[in-house]
């Protein structure tokens, strides 16, 4: 189905992200009083209107080439160039400033074909529009309050009228191998998480083969989670770049706290999580905390070590890190890191293959009959312990209650007598027997009772 793109454009802190959240009916963009929170393009289906994609953009700031502000503006220019309709957002409280006039000229220069709507935000109270608004030269204008939802439906009417009147409008189609937003949510939700500056955004750009998200030597460049739909070997994937996660006591600014919370929210909604480790810093406690959180949420884990091009004694380094992972990552025994260089595009294919395989394991189901045959063999190879009164503990029956991740319910006569080591044995044996990827957590639920089918 064809989908038109509406780009929200303007100087920093005029309320573009608030309007984006309002139009998409989801809090996908972080909103903060501090200017420059949005640094990458964010796409979402506008749930208020059918067949419409809305794009949040970084604030337009005119700066020297190579600066962060300049690179952010390049992100906005991509959105301006591809948009069918541009909502040029200005601030009614500050009024029209010289930078607004520069932004208007920039829009006209880079997109002469699309219609532009002047959206005057923060008009909670009625205002009188002076000539400075009209001097911007846009025929369509509307006063709204994105924060309070005033004028949103009226804005929607203007957008729909433009789309219906302009028969020549070229709209986005979702038949491309890689598109920025797909109306149908892809099967595999793949989150890339890790400490700041470990190369998450560089990894995204490397596999997409384009500068989709901002990168640089500065720590903490990514603030919002950024979603990109993509296809790999026939598998639809939603890649999600996230803000780096530092230790709690190191997070002092409220905007960083919002970014970290957004990252943890992304983990909760992901299927598979790539936990990226900086090879120059090695495995740290914060990496283990991220892994532990993702495992507790039931996400599949793919462990990736980036920046391996900066390591001189690679064999010694990998041997030592493998040892540390085997010792420290006890929740998912047997997981092996994948060593890459996102900057040099080295070994990226191995990561993608592992993600697809882990996803298949994560949603695997085993029939009840096959499962009980496995259980009988596992208990035969390693019998259960005796109870205090000399009677052996018995697991009488098991069934898989859910996948994503695999969850097994086992009925036994004495739950307390089954220790943690035997539970780990069952999990490891199950994964080995049914070819479950090492990064997939398997959950066991023990219930005291008889076989419910006898």
Swiss-Prot record:
CDD domains linked to this entry: EngA1, EngA2
Domain KH-like: residue ranges: 364-450
Residues in the signal sequence: none
InterPro entries: G_ENGA, GTP-bd, GTPase_Der, KH_dom-like, KH_dom-like_a/b, P-loop_NTPase, Small_GTP-bd
Keywords per UniProt: GTP-binding, Nucleotide-binding, Repeat, Ribosome biogenesis
Domain EngA-type G: 4-167, 188-363
Residues that hold GTP 1 according to the record: 10-17, 56-60, 121-124
GO BP terms, alphabetized: ribosome biogenesis
Pfam families the UniProt entry points to: KH_dom-like (PF14714), MMR_HSR1 (PF01926)
A single MF term (Gene Ontology): GTP binding
Residues binding GTP 2: 194-201, 241-245, 306-309
Subunit structure: Associates with the 50S ribosomal subunit.
Record's function text: GTPase that plays an essential role in the late steps of ribosome biogenesis.
Family assignment from sequence similarity: Belongs to the TRAFAC class TrmE-Era-EngA-EngB-Septin-like GTPase superfamily. EngA (Der) GTPase family.
Name of this protein: GTPase Der
Lineage, uppermost ranks: Bacteria, Pseudomonadati, Pseudomonadota, Alphaproteobacteria, Rickettsiales
């Amino acid at each position: 189905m064809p989908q038109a793109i509406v780009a929200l454009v303007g100087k920093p802190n005029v309320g573009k992200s608030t309007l984006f959240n309002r139009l998409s009916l989801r809090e996908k963009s972080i909103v903060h009083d501090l200017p420059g929170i949005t640094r990458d393009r964010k796409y979402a289906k506008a749930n208020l209107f059918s067949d419409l994609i809305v794009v949040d953009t970084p604030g337009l700031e005119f700066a020297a080439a190579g600066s962060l502000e300049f690179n952010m503006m390049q992100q906005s220019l991509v959105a301006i160039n591809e948009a069918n309709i541009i909502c040029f957002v200005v601030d009614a409280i500050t009024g029209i400033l010289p930078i607004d006039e520069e932004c208007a000229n920039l829009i006209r220069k880079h997109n002469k074909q699309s219609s532009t709507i002047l959206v005057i935000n923060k008009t909670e109270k009625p205002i009188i529009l002076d000539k400075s608004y009209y001097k911007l030269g846009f025929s369509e204008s509307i006063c709204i309050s994105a924060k309070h939802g005033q004028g949103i439906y009226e804005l929607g009417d203007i957008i729909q009228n433009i789309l219906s009147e302009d028969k020549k409008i070229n709209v986005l189609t979702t038949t491309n191998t890689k598109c920025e937003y797909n109306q149908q949510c892809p099967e595999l939700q793949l989150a890339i998480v890790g400490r700041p500056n470990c190369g998450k955004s560089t990894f995204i750009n490397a596999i997409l083969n384009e500068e989709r998200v901002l990168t640089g030597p500065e720590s903490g460049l990514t603030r919002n989670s950024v979603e990109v739909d993509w296809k790999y070997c026939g598998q639809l994937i939603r890649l999600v770049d996230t803000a780096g996660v530092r230790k709690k006591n190191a997070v002092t600014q409220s905007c960083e706290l919002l970014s970290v919370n957004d990252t943890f929210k992304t983990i909760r909604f992901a299927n598979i999580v790539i936990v990226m480790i900086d090879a120059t810093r090695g495995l740290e406690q914060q990496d283990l905390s991220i892994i532990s959180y993702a495992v507790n949420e039931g996400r599949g884990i793919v462990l990736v070590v980036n920046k391996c091009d900066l390591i001189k004694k690679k064999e010694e380094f990998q041997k030592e890190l493998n040892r540390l992972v085997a010792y420290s990552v006890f929740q998912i025994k047997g997981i092996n890191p994948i060593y890459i260089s996102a900057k040099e595009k080295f070994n990226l294919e191995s990561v993608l293959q592992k993600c697809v395989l882990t996803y298949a394991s994560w949603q695997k189901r085993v029939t009840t009959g096959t499962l009980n045959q496995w259980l009988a063999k596992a208990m035969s190879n390693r019998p259960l312990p005796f109870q205090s009164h000399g009677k052996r503990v018995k697991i009488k029956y098991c069934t898989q209650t859910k996948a994503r991740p695999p969850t097994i319910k086992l009925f036994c006569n004495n739950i307390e007598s089954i220790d943690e080591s035997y539970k780990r044995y069952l999990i490891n044996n199950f994964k080995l027997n049914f070819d479950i990827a090492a990064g997939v957590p398997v959950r066991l639920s023990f219930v005291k009772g008889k076989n419910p089918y006898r």
